[in-house]
């Protein structure tokens, strides 16, 4: 909660001079000029979403807290136990509201802060949650480090990324299951990389593996990779197949929680990206989607 207030204060200090523009003052004296500042554009986007009755989860949390403070005379005792999975996807403000509105409820909160792909809003460490929830003798924090998904080779590779993503606080302990080494290859051109990728996909399928993912940094890179690969190898619509078979080209944000027999990381620049904790978390999520094989390709 304190972190959220600090964020609001920082936002105010940065954007307070732009408030006349946000309120509708003409830009540079032109009454037809569109909103031009980042703050004004963000405000207009927010208004458009409200008109469509699309609400941000943090706005809903704030409104729930206001409603509780103004109208509710007693805490809500409807829920005895609340389970929360993928806890890293929500910021501490959400948990403050839940704890305030449901003071008598027991919580089981599960997640992996190393897989927080919403770096600016989600949980990047468990510390703030400790302060909010671990106040009684019965409250516990349990750290599960065993990785049953990946081979030792993939887990060790991901572990080196994790050193940056979590400052070394949370380490992987893989089960004993060996596989082939992680392959890293650099190419002169996107076309050369696409041709190599098509060959990899064919070899992976020959081994009897059913699912392969070509994981890209974002939707733009995924669209580019798809256009290069589609003339060279069959690709599957992931939504239509429920990820049960074939080769999918996907951005990182769509693969969290999924797993594939083999993963090809497409131009994610694993050598330089991990220096930034924000990027390291994305790379860690991408690398740990692989069950048996991980190939890292860059151009």
Where are these regions (language model features)?
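Conserved helicase motor core of SF1/SF2 NTP-dependent helicases
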Residues: 43-44, 68-81, 88-299
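Conserved helicase NTPase catalytic core signature
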Residues: 1-81, 94-95
